[in-house]
Amino acid sequence: MRPLDAKKDHYRKMAREQGYRSRAAYKLKELNKAYRIIGAGFTVLDLGCAPGSWMQVAASAAGNRGTVLGVDLEYAEELNHAESMRGDVEDESLAETVAERLGRADAVICDLSPQVSGNWSVDHARQISLNYAAARIMGRVLAPKGNAVFKVFDGEYAAEFREHMGHMFSKTKSTKPQASRKQSSELYLVCLGFRG
Protein backbone atom coordinates (compact mmCIF):
# COMPACT_ATOMS: atom_id res chain seq x y z
CA MET A 1 0.00 0.00 0.00
CA ARG A 2 1.29 3.42 -0.88
CA PRO A 3 1.88 5.74 2.12
CA LEU A 4 -0.76 8.21 0.90
CA ASP A 5 -3.35 5.41 0.60
CA ALA A 6 -2.46 4.14 4.08
CA LYS A 7 -3.25 7.55 5.56
CA LYS A 8 -6.72 7.38 4.01
CA ASP A 9 -7.36 3.78 5.12
CA HIS A 10 -10.37 3.87 7.45
CA TYR A 11 -9.73 0.42 8.96
CA ARG A 12 -6.08 1.13 9.57
CA LYS A 13 -7.01 4.31 11.42
CA MET A 14 -9.66 2.49 13.48
CA ALA A 15 -7.19 -0.27 14.35
CA ARG A 16 -4.72 2.27 15.67
CA GLU A 17 -7.44 4.07 17.66
CA GLN A 18 -8.93 0.87 19.09
CA GLY A 19 -5.63 -0.81 19.94
CA TYR A 20 -5.61 -3.56 17.33
CA ARG A 21 -2.27 -4.61 15.93
CA SER A 22 -3.49 -4.37 12.34
CA ARG A 23 -6.53 -3.63 10.22
CA ALA A 24 -6.98 -7.39 9.69
CA ALA A 25 -8.80 -7.50 13.04
CA TYR A 26 -11.91 -6.09 11.37
CA LYS A 27 -11.97 -8.90 8.82
CA LEU A 28 -12.22 -11.53 11.55
CA LYS A 29 -14.67 -9.43 13.58
CA GLU A 30 -16.95 -9.21 10.55
CA LEU A 31 -16.60 -12.90 9.72
CA ASN A 32 -17.25 -13.94 13.30
CA LYS A 33 -20.30 -11.72 13.58
CA ALA A 34 -21.76 -13.22 10.41
CA TYR A 35 -20.83 -16.89 10.94
CA ARG A 36 -20.08 -17.32 14.67
CA ILE A 37 -16.81 -19.11 14.02
CA ILE A 38 -15.61 -18.44 17.59
CA GLY A 39 -17.86 -18.48 20.64
CA ALA A 40 -17.46 -17.94 24.37
CA GLY A 41 -15.19 -20.50 26.00
CA PHE A 42 -13.73 -21.71 22.69
CA THR A 43 -10.23 -23.03 22.30
CA VAL A 44 -8.82 -21.41 19.16
CA LEU A 45 -5.76 -22.12 17.02
CA ASP A 46 -4.57 -19.11 14.99
CA LEU A 47 -2.21 -20.15 12.18
CA GLY A 48 -0.22 -17.29 10.67
CA CYS A 49 -0.96 -15.15 13.71
CA ALA A 50 1.62 -12.35 13.45
CA PRO A 51 1.30 -9.50 14.22
CA GLY A 52 -1.54 -10.73 16.43
CA SER A 53 -4.70 -8.83 15.52
CA TRP A 54 -6.64 -12.04 14.87
CA MET A 55 -5.40 -13.34 18.25
CA GLN A 56 -6.81 -10.18 19.82
CA VAL A 57 -10.22 -10.70 18.22
CA ALA A 58 -10.23 -14.43 18.99
CA ALA A 59 -9.29 -13.85 22.64
CA SER A 60 -12.08 -11.30 22.97
CA ALA A 61 -14.65 -13.60 21.33
CA ALA A 62 -13.57 -16.64 23.39
CA GLY A 63 -13.61 -14.63 26.60
CA ASN A 64 -12.12 -15.46 29.99
CA ARG A 65 -12.98 -19.15 29.71
CA GLY A 66 -11.42 -19.45 26.26
CA THR A 67 -7.89 -20.11 25.10
CA VAL A 68 -6.05 -18.96 21.99
CA LEU A 69 -2.76 -20.30 20.65
CA GLY A 70 -1.15 -18.39 17.80
CA VAL A 71 1.53 -19.89 15.57
CA ASP A 72 3.72 -18.00 13.12
CA LEU A 73 7.26 -17.91 11.76
CA GLU A 74 7.51 -14.46 13.33
CA TYR A 75 7.10 -13.57 16.97
CA ALA A 76 3.66 -12.31 18.04
CA GLU A 77 3.30 -10.72 21.45
CA GLU A 78 1.09 -12.72 23.80
CA LEU A 79 -2.15 -11.44 25.34
CA ASN A 80 -4.44 -12.41 28.20
CA HIS A 81 -5.92 -15.80 27.26
CA ALA A 82 -3.71 -15.94 24.16
CA GLU A 83 -0.27 -17.46 23.83
CA SER A 84 1.94 -17.59 20.79
CA MET A 85 4.70 -19.81 19.56
CA ARG A 86 7.00 -19.81 16.60
CA GLY A 87 6.41 -22.54 14.11
CA ASP A 88 6.26 -23.33 10.41
CA VAL A 89 2.97 -24.78 9.18
CA GLU A 90 4.94 -26.77 6.62
CA ASP A 91 6.89 -28.54 9.36
CA GLU A 92 5.18 -31.91 9.67
CA SER A 93 5.97 -32.13 13.39
CA LEU A 94 4.07 -28.91 14.15
CA ALA A 95 0.67 -30.62 14.28
CA GLU A 96 1.81 -32.88 17.11
CA THR A 97 3.46 -29.99 18.97
CA VAL A 98 0.27 -27.93 18.72
CA ALA A 99 -1.91 -30.88 19.77
CA GLU A 100 0.26 -31.47 22.85
CA ARG A 101 0.14 -27.81 23.81
CA LEU A 102 -3.47 -27.00 22.95
CA GLY A 103 -5.40 -30.26 22.94
CA ARG A 104 -8.54 -30.04 20.84
CA ALA A 105 -9.56 -26.75 19.24
CA ASP A 106 -13.11 -25.55 18.70
CA ALA A 107 -11.98 -23.22 15.92
CA VAL A 108 -8.98 -22.84 13.64
CA ILE A 109 -8.38 -19.45 12.05
CA CYS A 110 -5.83 -19.01 9.31
CA ASP A 111 -4.74 -15.70 7.81
CA LEU A 112 -1.57 -17.08 6.21
CA SER A 113 0.16 -15.25 3.42
CA PRO A 114 3.51 -16.00 1.81
CA GLN A 115 6.17 -13.39 1.28
CA VAL A 116 4.69 -11.88 -1.86
CA SER A 117 7.07 -11.99 -4.82
CA GLY A 118 5.06 -9.89 -7.24
CA ASN A 119 4.53 -12.86 -9.55
CA TRP A 120 0.82 -13.55 -9.09
CA SER A 121 0.87 -17.17 -10.28
CA VAL A 122 3.70 -18.03 -7.88
CA ASP A 123 2.17 -16.10 -4.96
CA HIS A 124 -1.25 -17.68 -5.46
CA ALA A 125 0.13 -21.22 -5.70
CA ARG A 126 2.33 -20.64 -2.64
CA GLN A 127 -0.57 -19.28 -0.57
CA ILE A 128 -2.80 -22.23 -1.45
CA SER A 129 0.05 -24.61 -0.59
CA LEU A 130 0.32 -22.98 2.84
CA ASN A 131 -3.43 -23.48 3.28
CA TYR A 132 -3.14 -27.19 2.56
CA ALA A 133 -0.38 -27.42 5.18
CA ALA A 134 -2.56 -25.51 7.65
CA ALA A 135 -5.50 -27.79 6.85
CA ARG A 136 -3.39 -30.82 7.77
CA ILE A 137 -2.71 -29.27 11.18
CA MET A 138 -6.38 -28.36 11.50
CA GLY A 139 -7.35 -31.97 10.80
CA ARG A 140 -5.21 -33.09 13.73
CA VAL A 141 -6.55 -30.64 16.34
CA LEU A 142 -10.05 -29.48 15.36
CA ALA A 143 -12.84 -31.05 17.39
CA PRO A 144 -15.86 -32.57 15.62
CA LYS A 145 -18.40 -29.84 14.75
CA GLY A 146 -15.62 -27.24 15.05
CA ASN A 147 -15.25 -24.28 12.71
CA ALA A 148 -12.47 -22.80 10.62
CA VAL A 149 -11.72 -19.84 8.39
CA PHE A 150 -8.92 -19.58 5.83
CA LYS A 151 -7.63 -16.64 3.83
CA VAL A 152 -7.54 -17.70 0.18
CA PHE A 153 -5.89 -15.82 -2.65
CA ASP A 154 -8.48 -16.08 -5.41
CA GLY A 155 -7.17 -17.78 -8.51
CA GLU A 156 -6.96 -21.04 -10.39
CA TYR A 157 -6.42 -23.25 -7.30
CA ALA A 158 -8.97 -21.59 -5.00
CA ALA A 159 -11.93 -23.72 -6.12
CA GLU A 160 -9.89 -26.90 -5.67
CA PHE A 161 -9.01 -25.90 -2.10
CA ARG A 162 -12.64 -25.05 -1.35
CA GLU A 163 -13.73 -28.45 -2.68
CA HIS A 164 -11.06 -30.14 -0.53
CA MET A 165 -12.36 -28.37 2.57
CA GLY A 166 -15.96 -29.04 1.59
CA HIS A 167 -15.38 -32.76 2.11
CA MET A 168 -14.43 -32.11 5.74
CA PHE A 169 -17.17 -29.67 6.76
CA SER A 170 -20.95 -29.54 6.74
CA LYS A 171 -20.89 -26.08 5.15
CA THR A 172 -18.31 -23.91 3.39
CA LYS A 173 -18.71 -20.42 2.01
CA SER A 174 -16.30 -18.06 0.26
CA THR A 175 -16.78 -14.44 1.22
CA LYS A 176 -14.97 -11.12 1.11
CA PRO A 177 -15.34 -8.97 4.22
CA GLN A 178 -15.89 -5.26 3.74
CA ALA A 179 -12.66 -4.70 5.66
CA SER A 180 -10.73 -6.34 2.79
CA ARG A 181 -9.40 -3.86 0.29
CA LYS A 182 -11.46 -3.80 -2.89
CA GLN A 183 -8.43 -4.34 -5.10
CA SER A 184 -7.25 -7.31 -3.03
CA SER A 185 -7.70 -10.81 -4.43
CA GLU A 186 -8.12 -12.26 -0.95
CA LEU A 187 -11.25 -14.14 -0.05
CA TYR A 188 -12.06 -15.96 3.16
CA LEU A 189 -13.28 -19.53 3.18
CA VAL A 190 -15.58 -20.06 6.15
CA CYS A 191 -15.89 -23.72 7.14
CA LEU A 192 -18.57 -24.76 9.63
CA GLY A 193 -19.27 -28.11 11.27
CA PHE A 194 -16.09 -30.18 11.03
CA ARG A 195 -16.95 -33.78 10.29
CA GLY A 196 -13.81 -35.02 12.06
From Swiss-Prot:
Main location: cytoplasm
InterPro entries: RNA_methyltr_RlmE, RNA_MeTrfase_FtsJ_dom, rRNA-MeTfrase_E, SAM-dependent_MTases_sf
Assigned keywords, A-Z: Cytoplasm, Methyltransferase, rRNA processing, S-adenosyl-L-methionine, Transferase
Annotated residues for binding of S-adenosyl-L-methionine: G52, W54, D72, D88, D111
Active site, renumbered: K151 (proton acceptor)
Catalytic activity: uridine(2552) in 23S rRNA + S-adenosyl-L-methionine = 2'-O-methyluridine(2552) in 23S rRNA + S-adenosyl-L-homocysteine + H(+)
Pfam families reported for this sequence: FtsJ (PF01728)
GO molecular function: rRNA (uridine-2'-O-)-methyltransferase activity
Known EC number: 2.1.1.166
GO CC, one annotated term: cytoplasm
Annotated compartments: Cytoplasm
Tagged with keyword Disulfide bond: no
Family label: Belongs to the class I-like SAM-binding methyltransferase superfamily. RNA methyltransferase RlmE family.
Protein function: Specifically methylates the uridine in position 2552 of 23S rRNA at the 2'-O position of the ribose in the fully assembled 50S ribosomal subunit.
Stored PANTHER family: PRE-RRNA 2'-O-RIBOSE RNA METHYLTRANSFERASE FTSJ3 (PTHR10920:SF13), RIBOSOMAL RNA METHYLTRANSFERASE (PTHR10920)
Protein's name in the database: Ribosomal RNA large subunit methyltransferase E
Upper taxonomic lineage: Archaea, Nitrososphaerota, Candidatus Cenarchaeales, Candidatus Cenarchaeaceae, Candidatus Cenarchaeum
Gene: rlmE
